[in-house]
Amino acid sequence: MLVAEFKKYVFCCTHLSLTEADRMASLSLIKELAKGTRKPFFLAGDFNDEPASPFIQTLQQDFVILSDLNAPTFPASDPENTIDYITAYKKTARKLKVTSQRVANEPVASDHRPIVVELR
């Protein structure tokens, strides 16, 4: 997990485990980190789970998903699964508004397609 604190927000990039138990353990640590700031806290990366999964449902108790839940990102060559997300911690994201969201048409840079969210 990479955490970068900027003047107006905190951005956390992660690649979560393939196992649900490990993802849940990571989520507990991430929530503790998010609780420690008053700035908007963003969490993005490969969560290794689909939107309807128990893990994503648990995540949504504290984080709002800003990226498109219906836009597949994996595998990059022919995306069929939505497992990459951009989220924001609900307690610090109240004033954020999504102005656009998309999955970039970039099949070669990674095994996942990049996701882009623009906010105001």
Predicted features and spans:
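Active-site regions of metal-assisted phosphoester/phosphodiester hydrolases
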Residues: 1-120
